[in-house]
């Protein structure tokens, strides 16, 4: 079944049934990973353009692999390799690629709303791979997929997000998605990094990490953006690590079944200690693997194809 929309820009306007459809499709896609030949002809003849104007390893590589496993033709373009470096506008670049036959444009940009701007001006489908501090829907979806895969459900779980909530597109997208699927979401971090209106999104705000950890099923640790410290939004790296770093002592406060997540890249020794990142409760590597499945699912659904045995053979 195809998505109900031309573009996929965020989770703020996506209903629970559509989120579940994406997660179910990702489950079907992940089965392909177990095959000797990890490729299906589903999107043969389709062209996917990955337009990345911000540095990325995981997301960009994940979209590349996802498109290729579906047999799509894929081209990846960075800011430095595009005519934007020569002064061309984002829209002119995207329109040029569209008239060359792009079916889906995957875009990452530092400006909030960049993906929506392209979606309103292109006939090709636009998939948001992160726009400023606004949204990162595919990261939230792979996080939700990982939680559901490991815990068997999302509804009723207590999920804690730690760190810079104010500037995190990952946090915002996770909150939108998790609350729609019935999870109870908590956030914790320095007061300067917690938006004043965050409770309006249906979350519970904590100031003390040790208190916030009580009774949680999932801990999602955000990368601390070190440039924020230079702007005085928190006193020092050492103080942040002391009050908000996930270490072995805090790990012991969790139940054995609780999950530890991180969207990457990690600042080991700051927001997360290696013993936590590499421990038995960590599902960080699974998040990366599941990212490919989620992005395959979205590319597949945006192309408007129906799931059947022939497509996945």
From Swiss-Prot:
<comment type="subunit">
    <text>Heterododecamer (2C3:3R2) of six catalytic PyrB chains organized as two trimers (C3), and six regulatory PyrI chains organized as three dimers (R2).</text>
</comment>
<dbReference type="InterPro" id="IPR002082">
    <property type="entry name" value="Asp_carbamoyltransf"/>
</dbReference>
<dbReference type="InterPro" id="IPR036901">
    <property type="entry name" value="Asp/Orn_carbamoylTrfase_sf"/>
</dbReference>
<feature type="binding site">
    <location>
        <position position="59"/>
    </location>
    <ligand>
        <name>carbamoyl phosphate</name>
    </ligand>
</feature>
<keyword id="KW-0665">Pyrimidine biosynthesis</keyword>
<dbReference type="GO" id="GO:0005829">
    <property type="term" value="C:cytosol"/>
</dbReference>
<dbReference type="GO" id="GO:0044205">
    <property type="term" value="P:'de novo' UMP biosynthetic process"/>
</dbReference>
<dbReference type="InterPro" id="IPR006131">
    <property type="entry name" value="Asp_carbamoyltransf_Asp/Orn-bd"/>
</dbReference>
<dbReference type="GO" id="GO:0016597">
    <property type="term" value="F:amino acid binding"/>
</dbReference>
<feature type="binding site">
    <location>
        <position position="169"/>
    </location>
    <ligand>
        <name>L-aspartate</name>
    </ligand>
</feature>
<feature type="binding site">
    <location>
        <position position="86"/>
    </location>
    <ligand>
        <name>L-aspartate</name>
    </ligand>
</feature>
<dbReference type="GO" id="GO:0006207">
    <property type="term" value="P:'de novo' pyrimidine nucleobase biosynthetic process"/>
</dbReference>
<comment type="pathway">
    <text>Pyrimidine metabolism; UMP biosynthesis via de novo pathway; (S)-dihydroorotate from bicarbonate: step 2/3.</text>
</comment>
<dbReference type="Pfam" id="PF00185">
    <property type="entry name" value="OTCace"/>
</dbReference>
<feature type="binding site">
    <location>
        <position position="223"/>
    </location>
    <ligand>
        <name>L-aspartate</name>
    </ligand>
</feature>
<feature type="binding site">
    <location>
        <position position="264"/>
    </location>
    <ligand>
        <name>carbamoyl phosphate</name>
    </ligand>
</feature>
<dbReference type="InterPro" id="IPR006132">
    <property type="entry name" value="Asp/Orn_carbamoyltranf_P-bd"/>
</dbReference>
<keyword id="KW-0808">Transferase</keyword>
<dbReference type="Pfam" id="PF02729">
    <property type="entry name" value="OTCace_N"/>
</dbReference>
<comment type="function">
    <text>Catalyzes the condensation of carbamoyl phosphate and aspartate to form carbamoyl aspartate and inorganic phosphate, the committed step in the de novo pyrimidine nucleotide biosynthesis pathway.</text>
</comment>
<comment type="similarity">
    <text>Belongs to the aspartate/ornithine carbamoyltransferase superfamily. ATCase family.</text>
</comment>
<feature type="binding site">
    <location>
        <position position="265"/>
    </location>
    <ligand>
        <name>carbamoyl phosphate</name>
    </ligand>
</feature>
<feature type="binding site">
    <location>
        <position position="58"/>
    </location>
    <ligand>
        <name>carbamoyl phosphate</name>
    </ligand>
</feature>
<dbReference type="InterPro" id="IPR006130">
    <property type="entry name" value="Asp/Orn_carbamoylTrfase"/>
</dbReference>
<feature type="binding site">
    <location>
        <position position="108"/>
    </location>
    <ligand>
        <name>carbamoyl phosphate</name>
    </ligand>
</feature>
<feature type="binding site">
    <location>
        <position position="136"/>
    </location>
    <ligand>
        <name>carbamoyl phosphate</name>
    </ligand>
</feature>
<dbReference type="GO" id="GO:0004070">
    <property type="term" value="F:aspartate carbamoyltransferase activity"/>
</dbReference>
<dbReference type="GO" id="GO:0006520">
    <property type="term" value="P:amino acid metabolic process"/>
</dbReference>
<feature type="binding site">
    <location>
        <position position="139"/>
    </location>
    <ligand>
        <name>carbamoyl phosphate</name>
    </ligand>
</feature>
<protein>
    <recommendedName>
        <fullName>Aspartate carbamoyltransferase catalytic subunit</fullName>
        <ecNumber>2.1.3.2</ecNumber>
    </recommendedName>
</protein>
């Amino acid at each position: 079944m195809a998505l109900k929309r031309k573009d996929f820009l965020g989770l703020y306007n996506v209903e629970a049934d559509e989120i579940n459809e994406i997660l179910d499709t990702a489950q079907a896609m992940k089965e392909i990973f177990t095959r000797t030949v990890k490729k299906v002809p589903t999107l043969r003849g389709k062209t996917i353009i990955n337009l990345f104007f911000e540095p990325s390893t995981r997301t960009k590589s994940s979209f590349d692999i996802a498109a290729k496993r579906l047999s799509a033709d894929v081209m990846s373009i960075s800011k430095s390799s595009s005519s934007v470096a020569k002064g061309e506008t984002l829209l002119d670049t995207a329109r040029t690629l569209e008239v060359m036959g792009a079916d889906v444009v995957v875009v990452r940009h530092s400006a909030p709303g960049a993906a929506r701007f392209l979606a309103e001006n292109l006939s090709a489908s636009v998939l948001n791979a992160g726009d400023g501090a606004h949204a990162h829907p595919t990261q939230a979806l792979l996080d939700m997929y990982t939680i559901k895969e490991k815990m068997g459900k999302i509804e009723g779980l207590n999920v804690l997000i730690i760190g810079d909530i104010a500037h995190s597109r990952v946090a915002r997208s996770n909150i939108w998605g998790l609350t729609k699927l019935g999870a109870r979401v908590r956030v914790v971090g320095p007061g300067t990094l917690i938006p004043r209106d965050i409770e309006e999104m249906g979350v519970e705000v904590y100031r003390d990490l040790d208190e916030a950890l009580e009774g949680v099923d999932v801990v999602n640790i955000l990368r601390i953006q070190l440039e924020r410290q230079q702007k005085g939004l928190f006193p020092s790296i050492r103080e942040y690590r002391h009050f908000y770093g996930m270490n072995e002592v805090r790990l012991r406060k969790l139940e054995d079944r609780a999950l530890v997540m991180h969207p990457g890249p990690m600042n080991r020794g700051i927001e997360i200690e290696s013993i936590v990142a590499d421990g038995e409760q960590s599902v960080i590597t699974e998040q990366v693997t599941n990212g490919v499945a989620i992005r395959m699912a979205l590319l597949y659904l945006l192309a408007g194809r129906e799931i059947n045995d022939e497509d996945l053979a």
